[in-house]
Structures are given as C-alpha cells and as structure tokens.
C-alpha cells in the first residue's frame, strides 16, 4: 500500500479489553452497565466504532458469558446515540503451559481453550456489525502464555462470521498474520471490503517503531481498509502515524490507560485526544453511517 494520508478517518474505541488493568485504573469498566456506558460516552466523544470485551462483574477477570455480551449489546443499541458495534472473538484461544521443564499439564487457571463454534457463539447471539479475528498464533506477553489460532480454527471462524453477515476485523500482530489474511480472502472466507487492525507494540508481535509499522502497512493490499494502534507509551502518537500512512485510528482503555504522562484517562478522553490529533492534521472524522457505507456493514 503506497504512503498516502487518509483524509476521512474513523475512530474505534477499544473499551475494556481482557488485560490485567482493572486494578491499575478506576476508569476501566467492568460490569455490562459500565462497559456500555463507557462505550456510549466514547461514541459521543467521536468514536464511530466501539470494540467490546466483557468481564466477570465480580472479579474483573475476562469472560465469555453470553448473558454479559447480550446485556452490553442491548444497552448500547438502546442508547440515544448511533455507533457501530464491534465484539471481540479473540477469547477461547488462551494456552498457558505448566513450566519450561513440564509443559503438561497446562495451567488450568490461565488456559481457556474452546472450539470455533463456541468462540463465536456470542457473535451468533448478538450479531454485531463487526467482530475481531486474531489471525495467527504467537507468544504473548510474559511466561508461558501462547495465543493460539490455528489455520483450521481461523478458517472455520471466518466462515461462520461471514455466514452470519458479520464483518470480520482481522487483527494482525505481525506480517505473517497479514499473509494468512490474504489466504483467507483468496479462499473466499472473508469478503471485500476487508478490514484490518494493525496491532503494534504487543509482546511478542511486531514492535511499534515506524520502520516495522511501515512494513506492516506495505503488506496491506491497497483495496483493504486498515486501522492501527500501539499500546503503552506510544499509544497516543499512533493516531498521527496511522492517518499519515493512510489508515484509521484505534484508542481506548484496552490499549492504554493514560492520556498524558501520569494522567489516567477515561475512554471518552482518549477519543477526544484522538479527534484533536486527527483534526489538527487536516483530516475529517467520519461517523457510524459513513463507516457502514465504507465497509458495507449491516446495521442491527
């Protein structure tokens, strides 16, 4: 994809994620009500898309419960503001080995493995306009945790998402994930317009330096739509990088807790900062209806 600034940008807000962030900021939403309210505030601040995980309301731990997804979905859809709903389908591929000398039995506390149909059950239940598809397996963070997404698993999940009329958002953590996404497209398992999220700076995928970022961008076909984000200290620099490279923007408490040095943020504040950055570059922020037209989404 040639370097060409995007002049019409949509912002995705990743509302809560599944990371161990609840104890680090009181702004991280936990209950379905909190998640939905935070998503709605992000939409009011300028996010056209909200990307939602769910958490156990009692512990804050990541969850896959259908009732939690249904409540979040219903609350967002009944709100007085329009927004494109994007649900994760990344859960159910978590494998934590025992230790380096005895990998089996696996760590039951951290391991959460499910089949393709179970991993997209909440997608079939809630029918969001978009859901994520983590397009590869990789060592994740520290210790012995592997995020597993085998080729056969990804093919079946993509097939089910497409059959449901839900647009997969390919989460690419490295260039090989883009390679496999192209294979899914060639096999007709994902359809045009293809949507990609470039996930930068997440150990141990692609680092978020600009050379690596542009290597990722250059592997995105020119007729595909992409967004990009980084986590941590470079998170609020990435809106500018993504737009300059021709892409769209993702911010949110899933990826970053701070709007400035030492300043814990809400999702709405992160979106407001992204809007300011994008508009200061001379680009236009587009809303949910324009995103639906661009991505050929089915509003629910």
Curated annotation (Swiss-Prot):
Keywords: Metal-binding, Transferase, Zinc. The keyword Transcription does not apply. Its cofactor is Zn(2+). PANTHER family: 3-KETO-5-AMINOHEXANOATE CLEAVAGE ENZYME (PTHR37418:SF2), 3-KETO-5-AMINOHEXANOATE CLEAVAGE ENZYME-RELATED (PTHR37418). InterPro entries: Aldolase_TIM, BKACE. Belongs to the BKACE family. Homotetramer. It catalyses: 3-dehydrocarnitine + acetyl-CoA = N,N,N-trimethylglycyl-CoA + acetoacetate. Pathway: Amine and polyamine metabolism; carnitine metabolism. Zn(2+) binds at residues 51, 53, 254. GO terms for molecular function: 3-keto-5-aminohexanoate cleavage activity; metal ion binding. Pfam families: BKACE (PF05853). This is 3-dehydrocarnitine:acetyl-CoA trimethylamine transferase.
């Amino acid at each position: 994809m040639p370097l060409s600034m995007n002049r019409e940008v949509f912002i995705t807000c990743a509302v809560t994620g599944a990371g161990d962030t609840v104890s680090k900021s009181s702004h991280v939403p936990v209950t379905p009500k909190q998640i939905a309210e935070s998503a709605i505030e992000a939409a009011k601040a300028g996010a056209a898309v909200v990307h939602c995980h769910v958490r156990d309301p009692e512990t804050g731990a990541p969850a896959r419960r259908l009732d939690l997804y249904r409540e979040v979905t219903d609350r967002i859809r009944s709100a007085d503001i329009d927004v494109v709903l994007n649900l994760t389908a990344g859960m159910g591929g978590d494998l934590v080995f025992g230790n380096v000398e005895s990998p089996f039995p696996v760590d039951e506390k951290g391991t959460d493995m499910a089949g393709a149909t179970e991993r997209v059950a909440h997608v079939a239940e809630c029918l969001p306009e978009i859901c994520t598809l983590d397009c590869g397996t990789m060592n994740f963070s520290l210790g012995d945790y592997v995020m597993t997404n085998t080729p056969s698993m990804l093919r079946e999940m993509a097939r089910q998402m497409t059959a449901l009329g839900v647009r997969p958002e390919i989460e690419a953590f490295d260039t090989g994930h883009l390679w496999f996404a192209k294979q899914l497209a060639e096999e007709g398992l994902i359809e045009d317009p293809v949507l990609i999220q470039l996930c930068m700076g997440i150990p141990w995928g692609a680092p978020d330096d600009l050379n690596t970022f542009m290597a990722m961008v250059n592997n995105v076909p020119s007729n595909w739509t992409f967004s990009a984000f980084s986590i941590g200290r470079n998170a609020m620099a990435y809106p500018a990088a993504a737009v300059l490279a021709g892409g769209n923007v993702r911010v949110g408490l899933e990826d970053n807790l701070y709007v400035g040095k030492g300043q814990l943020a809400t999702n709405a504040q992160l979106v407001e900062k992204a809007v300011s950055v994008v508009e200061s570059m001379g680009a236009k922020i587009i809303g949910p209806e324009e995103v639906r037209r661009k991505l050929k989404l089915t509003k629910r």
